[in-house]
Amino acid sequence: MTTPIIWSIAGLDSGGGAGLSADQRAADAMGVHLCPVAAAVTAQNSRAVEAVFPVPAEQLDAQLAALAQDLPPVVVKTGLLGGVAQLRVVTRWVDRLRERGPVALVVDPVLRASTGASFAGDELLQAYRDELLPRATVATPNRREADRLVGEGCPQQQSPLLGVQTVCITGGDAAGPLAQDWLHSPQASGWLALPWRAARNNHGTGCCFATALAAALAKGFVPADAAVLAKMLTTAGLLPDATPGAGAGPVRPAPGFITEAGLLPGLFDTPPARWPARPDGPPAIEGVYGIADSGAQAAELFDAGLTTVQLRLKRAAGESGAAWHTRLAAEVQPARDAARRHGATFIVNDHWRAALALGVDFVHLGQEDLLALDTTARADLAQARARGLRLGISSHSLWELARAVAWAPDYVACGPVWPTLTKAMPWRPQGLDNLAWWAAMSPVPVVGIGGVMVPEQMVRIAASGAAAGCVVRGLKELPVQDWLDAWRSGAGMPATPDPAWPHPSLGGA
């Protein structure tokens, strides 16, 4: 497999903390090839920036021309540019590269050093607004940079920044128990958060974040997934170690960050006040997880030995509310009664308010259901959870897994593991590698779902480390005992090694 190439056009930090030095560390941890292009040279140490010397425009142009002949990029990332002339060299080359094929542009608008030195006057700010940002795929300003670009007190949680489709406004330097970044993208919007880390080595966080995001785009991830990976890498590099100078030391991410479970962020609808607590007690589900399309089938599955069954019903077009609730109640009753007889777990899909009214205490919601919740419904669901309602959530991508984490559910479903005809969806199959990564990284149990047609597939799900495996159509074709035997066989096998990286489940940027 060819290693993706990205260009970073940024400043050279003589202290080795930020700029191209940070970009190189992030690119190495992400497993991409970085071409470091100097747009400015700085005289700085760990405490202060003493001077900035923009590289002459013709020298910057020569660097890019040389690279274009032999090392064309998948993604270009910009940092400190030094001046309007340098910015215009970049825009010209982005346009030339895009004439040859798709090239993403990640703009980290480095306008001020963390020590307070300003890198941009009014003319350069206007060039960002009028010339560079309109070409950007993603922009990653911090809160102060976003304010300078669009005006003080800008509504940062609103979309998008100066026409850029994906914006991630980083805010890890703000006080509070959580480090929160605002994400707006075509795939998802919300607050990416992780517990705040006290670290002296925090010089170059913005550079690392932007480069990691660029690298993730180069590896084929869509922007929302790329932002999740960038959050993970940057947090991993915040270390409490001794610093090489008197000021802040450099962020130092390592390749192993991708399998550190504590680095998976949550994606919250509103700014969170605290990190969500995990559900207490043993796993809510384990083993073979059946999905039935009627209450009678669900009851039969419980009687045949399944300990977890979900009832998946859809409201018919034109069906009135009263008729729907009557039908739902009639379908729920036999399944609920059978579950109680066997001490089993009965789950209702989607219809959480109706399920509660019918005495069901476990519901499953898809991502579209979560997005459809208004402020009142989110509050009501949270209150129901506090009173004991158990919850499972679907996920098909990194950002959906992060959104699920924010709800602290009882389990997360990962799918489709294999291609499925049960319902149309845009997602690529996750495969057993992504399922194993989900199982290793998720703070709650993971269920493998999608395309399970023969017992051997259930064996492989069990061996992946997942807590349970879903089967739908296969329950009508083979006896329940065949599926139970398959689960036991897989659960007794040596665990599948954790994959080094997940693969993208949607097409890239």
Q: Which ranges hold each PLM region?
A:
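Short glycine/threonine-rich catalytic loop with a Thr-x-Gly-x-Asp
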Residues: 13-17, 194-213, 449-450
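Glycine-rich beta-to-alpha transition loops that act as phosphate-gripper elements at the mouths
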Residues: 19, 172, 206-207, 291-294, ...
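Short, small-residue alpha-helix embedded
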Residues: 26, 148, 199-223
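Glycine-rich phosphate-binding active-site loops on the catalytic face of alpha/beta enzymes
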Residues: 35-43, 312-315, 366-376, 413-426, ...
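Ribokinase/PfkB-type carbohydrate-kinase core domain
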Residues: 45-138, 144-177, 223, 227-236, ...
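Charged C-terminal helix
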Residues: 51-54, 70, 225-283, 481-509
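Conserved phosphate/ATP/ADP-binding segment of small-molecule kinases
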Residues: 118-189, 326-407
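Alpha-helix-loop-beta-strand connector modules within alpha/beta enzyme cores
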Residues: 328-350, 377-396, 428-449, 453-454, ...
